[in-house]
């Protein structure tokens, strides 16, 4: 199969994959495309969110400092992205991202991009780097605390344990 993905993995993973019509609707109506910057930012920032970010940092200071130093990304940027994308990991999405990526691959608008993402994700599953049973995230196929797309994860990725959000 494509990308040297085993037939076994493909069959196992894609058996429950389905077309999600709502994903196409979400793709056509993204706030980043119709809200001006001021509106977009004001809807996603508040004193409450800032305080939640401070608490998250204080509770995870050692790990965040390791990530900041290892990847040379300021902790303030990391925390800001995490706050916007997942409210500090409290909402990482509920969509089956395999079905989301398959749906967006089928749709002609950005088929090439999403097909590539789907194939990368299948390869990561095939190599046992990601458990396909835990792949829930955004309608666009992003997942985790930072809502990364599969292409942002490489074969030589660094595993760091993040806190759970029970």
Which role fits each region the language model picked out?
Residues 1-68:
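An acidic, Gly/Ser/Thr/Pro-rich helix-cap/linker signature
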